Amino acid sequence: MIIHFNKHSKKIILNIFLALLLVYFIFHCIYGNKGIIAYLKVNRQLEKAYDELKNLRAERVELEHNVKLLRTESLNKDMLEEQAKKILGIAAPNEQVFTIKDIASQR
């Protein structure tokens, strides 16, 4: 069985093929591995990473400040006393110490 196409039907088939090809490329531009959706997802992850970096840098500055206060050349007595109480559990004879347990961390 031989099918013959006239010029009009060939144009229609070509247009359908080109339309399907266009739909394919548009779909992959939006939903593909390097498409718009993937780009937005990576941007959200990047923003979260920058926020975490900002928080970690602030924490680092605070820790560096605390270390500086505990160095012998600039020893801060209040900081030393606070760390002794916190880490070693030391308290002055006239002080009362109350320990509050975090219930959420025990689960």
From Swiss-Prot:
Q: Which compartment or compartments is the protein found in? A: Membrane
Principal localisation: membrane
> Where, by residue number, does the polypeptide cross the bilayer?
12-32
Q: Does the keyword Transmembrane helix apply?
A: yes
Q: What InterPro entries does UniProt report for this protein, alphabetically?
A: FtsL/DivIC
- Keyword Transmembrane helix: yes or no? yes
Q: Which Pfam families match?
A: DivIC
Keywords of the record, alphabetical order, are: Membrane, Transmembrane, Transmembrane helix
Q: Which Gene Ontology cellular component terms are annotated?
A: membrane
Q: How does it sit in the membrane?
A: Single-pass membrane protein
- Protein name as catalogued: Uncharacterized protein RP423
